[in-house]
């Protein structure tokens, strides 16, 4: 069996569970985010038998991205609670933060390396891990965030929780119409409304794939290739070409926002990431874990099954 690193997009997983799982503690508090996360963790561990688990938390957002685009992620709406239970479960920041704090504490009793780096986004940390720190390891990113498509290669896969499916590099063209090598570039043209990133008027994945066939190949294109191709066709009736040429500053800005590499991380932040990974020692503290679950009022969680799912972690 080859070694596999599970890379968890923690907030992505937690928010899914928090919004959908109505589980209440014996103290009468909503605890579905915490319980759902642990059950999800057990499930993906059983599926992939990881030898290492890296759980990446949001670090408060990227000031570098906000300096590039002040409207970045502005007004992003949080997921609502499961509507069937809305009247009974308080959907509050306080409850959510308490659940996250509880989850972080519980994960410390498990062989899970938690990574938190201030003033940067989870996406950037995962991008750095995949491209540099863990570049030679087989990795499975657990997230529903499509931004990670740009990281896919023979060493990196994505497990989409919602659809319970594995996405590999060759799958991206069927899912989006463009290759994983050019997904980021295509998204710079299309934009990302969920993060308040405007794109080029009339640009969608289907249309940019049609007008710029290089985006469908496994050869990585660059910004200037798109600009030159659009300029060469600017006199044609298709408006998309002129829109790209006239608004190319938007495309360049979007590249700085969407591309996952080291550009939005400082040297100190990269050192922090490497230090956390290099110095982590896995632990399995069953008794302390069970005591904390009792204290939190979390009942009927299969601790044995959770620990057994991580049997290969070293």
Predicted regions and their residues:
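Noncatalytic, basic helical substrate-engagement surface that gates or grips nucleic-acid strands
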Residues: 2-142, 148-166, 259, 264-279
